[in-house]
Amino acid sequence: HTEITNTYFNLKIKQTDFVLLKNSVLVKKYEFENKNNIELNVNFLVHSKLLTDYNNMVSGEVKNNTLIQYCHDYTMYTFSDKPFLSYQINNTKENISSGVIKDKDYIGMSCDSSISYDIGTLKPNEKKELTVYLYFKKSDETEEILNKELTEIKKLDVKKEEQTVEKYWK
């Protein structure tokens, strides 16, 4: 895992990444801890610029609280069991540094997308978690089957899955 402390806000972030053993899902678990003596209102932004090569166009959209990025025969789904606070497809590089992205429908090819989650207000010494899933999938299934798979992934016991992966690699 990786630990980062924002010294200005005194916010500690612990990131743990692992891949599920049974399918192509990258699990990114974040733990936020307020080391400050004041409450902190925390939002978490994810920026994705999917690019396989310069001649391979990518398109993005948001459906069912999932960022979907298409790239010819493959699709990447970015989601959590928590709802989005906001999202933006296209030109997110211009806004993301402000910490605010705007819900904006965009029709066209764009590899540049962002989503944000409301972690909420953290009291001093309080911890909260967010798990983000990245699911890489060959685009050969119906939407119904895919929605069922995404629902099952959201229901996973992340701690149990992490222990299973650790045990496998030891």
Residue ranges and their predicted role:
Residues E3-T5, F9-Y106, S113-S116, P124, ...:
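Polysaccharide-binding surfaces and accessory modules of carbohydrate-active proteins
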Residues E141-I145:
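Short conserved micro-motifs at the rims of enzyme active sites and ligand-binding pockets
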Residues Y133, W169-K170:
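Short amphipathic alpha-helical segments enriched in leucine
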Residues L40, G120-D140:
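Short Pro-Gly-centered flexible turn/kink motifs
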